[in-house]
């Protein structure tokens, strides 16, 4: 199986990180210097993915690696999602 990125889980992960640091969509928009909030809502809802540049900035904002933000179907991602969702 070819590894693929799961946009929905990645969006949920971004949402979780925003909640952890008590950041609003507006806060992230300002930090990324985006013209509107629509892109961020698309990420959070799994409609689209942040660009690699935005992922890089988000990783800095949240103090994590890009791999910690992006979720896919590789076994280590599936285990990580289970742990976050069920164990905390």
Describe these PLM feature segments:
Residues 14, 28-29, 40-43, 69:
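Conserved hydrophobic/aromatic packing and binding residues within compact polymer-binding modules
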Residues 1-4, 60, 70-88:
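Short, charged recognition helix plus adjacent turn
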Residues 34-50, 71-72:
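Recognition helix of helix-turn-helix/homeodomain-like DNA-binding domains
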Residues 1-23, 31:
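A short, Lys/Arg-rich alpha-helix, primarily the initiator
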Residues 53-68:
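DNA major-groove recognition helix of helix-turn-helix/homeodomain DNA-binding modules
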Residues 27-30, 58:
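Short alpha-helical "recognition helix" segments of helix-turn-helix
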